């Protein structure tokens, strides 16, 4: 499980993949604004880069009395190729159900070889900053 704000960081998404994750869920409570366009950009990229499915869940409506803004919903499932294959609306509480072809995980991982072709010896600076 990746939680809300975590989705902005590819390092954690990679660790989940390297540890064998096949399906990653990211529950979120995000309002419209700066990060909305990233909602359908970052998580499909994580799924494709790591060869796993993602369930990307965002709430809908407004939270009173705080009135932080409108939660934009748009929950979806994305496959290991980075393709969104089921999506909910922006405005309604919905139950989104989808079938996952788990064979696709190995197919994508063996085709793209992103884990094999990593060069962790060049990443040391990431942990020093």
Go through the PLM ranges and name each one:
Residues 9, 61, 102-106, 120:
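Low-complexity, compositionally biased segments
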């Amino acid at each position: 499980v990746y939680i809300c704000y975590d989705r902005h960081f590819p390092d954690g998404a990679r660790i989940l993949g390297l540890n064998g994750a096949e399906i990653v869920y990211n529950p979120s409570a995000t309002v419209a604004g700066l990060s909305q366009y990233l909602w359908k950009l970052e998580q499909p990229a994580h799924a494709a880069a790591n060869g796993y499915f993602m369930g990307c869940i965002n709430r809908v409506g407004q939270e009173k009395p705080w009135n932080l803004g409108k939660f934009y919903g748009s929950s979806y499932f994305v496959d290991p190729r980075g393709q969104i294959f089921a999506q909910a609306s922006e405005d309604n509480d919905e139950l989104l159900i989808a079938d996952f072809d788990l064979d696709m995980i190995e197919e994508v991982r063996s085709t793209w070889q992103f884990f094999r072709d990593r060069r962790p010896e060049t990443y040391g600076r990431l942990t020093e900053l």
